[in-house]
Amino acid sequence: MAHSQLLSSEERLFCYRWFHSLLAKELSEPQLQALQAGQFASFFAFLAELGFQPQVTDLQNELAKLTAYDSPRLELAADFAQCFLLEGKLSALPYASYYLDERDLSENLAVMDQWLTKFQLKINRLHNEPSDHLCIYLEVLIKLIETEQPVQVQQQFIRQQLLGWLPQWAEKTAQIHSSTAFYQIISNLLLGFLQQDIT
């Protein structure tokens, strides 16, 4: 049964907000400390119950390994840049435009523009964040859940707006050579969660 039917809206919101917080920008010191201090232990157990035990174990192992670094946060910041901020041949750019052809992208962004207008979501021009950034999609999905849009609408958004390109992004992220596998694991976990959310 899909998460959208199995889980409460609050549980799904927590999950998608968590993914958004990890992928929107480099982790802050408080974010990393919370992860390492076990503040998300119950959440990790929750993910494991949903069938993501391998990813949870890998993530916990990576968090443990970070303690060996003099500056774990800076190490993760470097990994974030390596995974997502360099040019396309070197990074897994988190933009739909990098993976969709012109026609599919045009259709995808037309739907996105409708939802952005409906929810009055403003793109962060200060950081030059295009509307096809992964985290903008997650913001719209969060709004769909918050405003209690029909489950079919939420699932259609995931299927058509995200899963048309996210598997390629996650696959490319998995191929990036970085100091840790933190973001590779998070990307794989997000993809798996989205796929379960519509099945």
Swiss-Prot record:
Gene3D superfamilies: 1.20.120.1820, HscB, C-terminal domain. The keyword Isomerase does not apply. It is found in: Cytoplasm. InterPro entries: Chaperone_TorD, DMSO/NO3_reduct_chaperone, HscB_C_sf, TorD-like_sf, TorD/DmsD_chaperones. GO terms for cellular component: cytoplasm. Keywords: Chaperone, Cytoplasm. The keyword 4Fe-4S does not apply. One of its GO terms (biological process) is protein complex oligomerization. Belongs to the TorD/DmsD family. TorD subfamily. Involved in the biogenesis of TorA. Acts on TorA before the insertion of the molybdenum cofactor and, as a result, probably favors a conformation of the apoenzyme that is competent for acquiring the cofactor. This is Chaperone protein TorD.
